[in-house]
Amino acid sequence: MLHIVNKSPLERPSLDACLRIAEPGAILLIEDAVYAAARGSAAAARLAEAGKRHKVYVLLPDAEARAIADRLIEGVATVDYGGFVDLVAEHRNCQSWL
């Protein structure tokens, strides 16, 4: 399953809920959720740990728009919009965490 998170971990508990209950699969961080993947962020350690169970992706245009593309934690892969579409097509189900 592809889990899509779009809210900052400082704004909503969506990412924590996803990490806590999601079955292994892929997690895509988009919009303000990309802040979680920045080195030194409050959620970086939790996200790095989640990388053991999930493949974690960040939408690169969103990271670039927030000036954190060069500060992403180890193990996080970046995708462009075409990669976003590919992830959706590769996974049978998608869950958006609001």
Language-model segments: what does each one mean?
Residues 25-31, 54-62:
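Short internal beta-strands
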Residues 1-14, 32-40:
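Short, glycine-rich nucleotide/cofactor-binding loops
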Residues 66-98:
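C-terminal structural segments of small proteins and small subunits
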